[in-house]
């Protein structure tokens, strides 16, 4: 059996400080991931020709981009938890097998999106718009993102492997390298600066995938050089049905949870399209702006999950309790700060994009109303990570389905009907998000109490 250190920081550091130590780099990493989406939008919206149409095109492409992220990160979460739990149990050989099978799955995932990028993009975009200019720009952008998506898919894996062993600072450095490259390349490739060809919307896509490939390269180097808890062996890449099943027992709810963001965004695009094209553009921009806050909660969740999973493997009730306590406190603080920031800077932030007066007002209204849901959204996100850590994948899935599908889209549709009948103003549509998050938070708390009794009280030691 592979030799495992008896004591390491995942086992002996107080959860209160360990969560900050691991969480801060992960938060930064996730916020930087949001940079990819918002930076592209900022630059294309200020293009000389058709800036607002270009922003609309990116909004239509966004659900599929999020699906790539969902499957990549969800698979990574499954590998992350399995590796972390195996190391906590002292089973290093199985941790190696889980990591190797993660590589195999990343190859399969990339192949699927490569095929979609070559043959399925136009059909998908065509379901959301009849505007020829928007259709062409959205297809150009999304095709590039899919064909070169190997950077995003494989980075998601190596990022989670670094996080699984407590080396989240390295994954953050890799994310920073890609984000900086993206920010630098965006204006150069979109506007044709420094002698570069003026690519327009295509330039935004090229800058994005180049940044992702750079992040992958750096993360892979860090993994090979510093992730000594995991042995990299080609034989571990050979697919093992049982290992893959275990990865997706954990990861599938995470994939569905992330994919539901795609479904929700796609659904909102269709629903809001019955009101006006400006509503779709405003929604797309507000959604990317709010990701800076929500992704911070996702980052902390990604620290909560391996810490709590490791404690679950140790059967340490105290460390599990501390994970729940401090995970909830830290997440609430993050979301409260995010709420305050959005309320204060909604106006100047939206003005950074080349929007018409109507679209900007709609975007400001969306930000101010939806930000009221941040505290409850944070509770839901944190609890989803906790559920995953203690074999509560189904509970995590239930919360995701409630907050991003079952509750929010029917409410949005009902409110849109009221708007189209001139019974209410457009602002009421945004209320669907806070209402859905509040109801989902109640469901989260109830499910946690039941799962805690089953998994923690009966199966762990003090």
Where do the model's predicted regions map?
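Small-residue hotspots at the loop-to-helix junctions and early N-terminal turns
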Residues: 52-63, 142, 205, 277-292, ...
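Short alpha-helical transmembrane segments in multi-pass integral membrane proteins
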Residues: 1-23, 83-150, 197-252, 308-373, ...
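Transmembrane helical elements of multi-pass membrane transporters/channels
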Residues: 21-40, 144, 178, 211-215, ...
